[in-house]
């Protein structure tokens, strides 16, 4: 009987990630500090326990100076790591863009900073020294007035950063450009020349993504190469001396698609491209296309992933933790109310992109999904910049973790212990497999709060009920110096 139950449990654990794909919120909402902060405009998770959140209109040190807050998960709640990272001066709007290659490094864009020229913009990189965020090197300033450098940033590692300045005029008015910098142990030094937009008004650099130090994808969402404002994306690789385009332009499908408004590369041979203005499924429903490199050309992987309804603007934000998983935001979707917003996760099943889970914004006008970040296939952060729970348009961010990663998390028992069913409606069977000396059973919730604790004498089987609402629970079984922990879903 025990072998059968164990086999059932193992088989269930194997098929569960394909079949259920449910996610539960990890901790409480992370609210913006004050009204009109628009916290959650940008989010980044370098791993499942760290998140950076931009509030580019925060007034903490000056009017609309902006700030970024980094949080760490302690097992039960999100705790701020260090102080706020504030912008330099009035109207800097620091935090519009950010990226974290690891949990101790962050690049932050302040696209209206006037350090070099008015609205030239700049980027600052910070390192965590164990107790505070310390700037690494000097500001990386934009080239000229109104460049808006720092509108987009991407860091594949702690010593490389790509910076988009979408209004730079080096190749024509508002053609835009991207610059890549590397750290030489003393300062940030440009790697290669500017990567300029193709023609005037392209706004190249509106989006940028680097999966590694030698590859970069650049979105120019107002390029007219395909047709008027269809947009395009170009991918470049470093040949040792210069940035060289890899393959042809990836053009948007139709006029006013704004393809390239969002891009993300999980690796050097995969790119996801958002076109929030695409009308394939309805006016401005939006779509996302994923492409792979076959050695010669960029080939679309599967068909278009279309927005659900008119004006959803699906594809406004994108995150790919790997080549077969994609999260995308539809910040104007009406799932729970007008412009409440949505985010969606899709998985490649070998032949098509399959919807795994959807996340609705909390309230009307939240614009949830304006930013998304997935550090892995089981965790997602979603920004809702107009949420007003802590003040009008203060914004908030929610983090969700997959409820499908169930089963044994830790054990040093020599014999097999089986807990079933999982998921459960509340009733649990615990088969210890052998008589154990005075086992103690402790149930805690996702926030580390103890829900139930029971002690037993010399038993090998028991039944108990999980009190409390549906959610994720942890069952700890102790007997002497032995311990095992199960992750259980209560439906």
What are these regions (language model features)?
Residues 409-420, 424-491:
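C-terminal outer-membrane/trafficking sorting elements
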Residues 20-404:
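Conserved beta-strand/short-helix segments
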Residues 13-16, 241, 318, 417, ...:
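Prokaryotic Sec-type signal peptides and long signal-anchor helices
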Residues 1-22:
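Bacterial Sec-dependent N-terminal signal peptides
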Residues 5-6, 405-409:
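Primarily marks secretory-pathway-exposed extracellular/lumenal segments that are disulfide-
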Residues 13-14, 285, 340, 433:
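Single-residue recognition of alpha-helix boundary sites
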Residues 10-13, 24, 315, 360, ...:
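Compositionally biased, low-structure terminal segments
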């Amino acid at each position: 009987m025990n072998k059968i139950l164990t086999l059932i449990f193992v088989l269930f654990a194997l098929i569960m990630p394909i079949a259920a794909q449910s996610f539960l919120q990890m901790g409480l909402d992370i609210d913006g500090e004050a009204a009109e902060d628009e916290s959650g405009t940008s989010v980044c998770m370098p791993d499942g326990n760290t998140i950076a959140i931009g509030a580019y209109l925060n007034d903490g040190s000056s009017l609309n100076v902006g700030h970024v807050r980094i949080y760490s998960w302690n097992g039960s709640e999100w705790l701020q790591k260090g102080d706020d990272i504030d912008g330099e001066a009035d109207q800097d709007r620091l935090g519009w863009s950010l990226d974290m290659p690891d949990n101790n490094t962050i690049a932050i864009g302040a696209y209206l900073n006037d350090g070099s020229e008015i609205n030239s913009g700049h980027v600052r990189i910070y390192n965590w020294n164990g107790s505070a965020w310390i700037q690494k090197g000097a500001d990386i300033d934009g080239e000229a007035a109104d460049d808006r450098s720092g509108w987009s940033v991407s860091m594949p590692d702690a010593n490389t950063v790509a910076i988009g300045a979408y209004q730079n005029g080096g190749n024509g008015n508002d053609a835009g450009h991207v610059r890549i910098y590397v750290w030489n142990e003393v300062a940030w030094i440009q790697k290669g020349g500017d990567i300029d937009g193709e023609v005037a008004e392209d706004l190249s650099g509106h989006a940028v993504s680097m999966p590694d130090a030698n590859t970069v994808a650049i979105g120019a969402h107002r390029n007219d190469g395909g047709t008027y404002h269809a947009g395009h994306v170009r991918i470049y690789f470093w040949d040792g001396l210069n940035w060289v385009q890899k393959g042809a332009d990836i053009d948007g499908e139709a006029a006013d698609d704004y393809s390239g408004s969002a891009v993300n590369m999980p690796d050097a041979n995969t790119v996801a491209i958002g076109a929030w203005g695409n009308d394939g499924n309805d006016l401005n429903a939006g779509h996302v296309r994923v492409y792979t490199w076959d050695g010669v050309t960029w080939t679309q992987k599967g068909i278009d992933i279309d927005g659900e309804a008119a004006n959803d603007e699906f594809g406004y934000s994108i995150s790919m933790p790997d080549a077969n998983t994609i999260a995308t935001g539809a910040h104007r979707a009406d799932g729970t109310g007008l412009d409440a917003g949505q985010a969606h996760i899709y998985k490649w099943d070998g032949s098509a992109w399959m919807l795994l889970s959807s996340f609705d914004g909390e309230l009307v006008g939240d614009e949830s999904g304006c930013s998304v970040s997935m550090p892995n296939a089981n965790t997602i952060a979603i920004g809702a910049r107009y949420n007003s729970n802590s003040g009008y348009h203060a914004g908030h961010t929610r983090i969700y973790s997959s409820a499908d990663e169930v089963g044994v998390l830790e054990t040093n028992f020599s014999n097999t212990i089986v807990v079933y069913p999982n998921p459960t409606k509340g009733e649990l069977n615990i088969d210890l497999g052998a008589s154990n000396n005075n086992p103690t059973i402790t149930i805690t919730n996702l926030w580390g709060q103890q829900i139930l604790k029971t002690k037993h004498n010399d038993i090998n089987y028991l039944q108990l009920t999980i009190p409390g609402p549906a959610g994720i629970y942890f069952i700890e079984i102790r007997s002497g110096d032995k311990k095992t922990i199960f992750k259980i879903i209560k439906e």
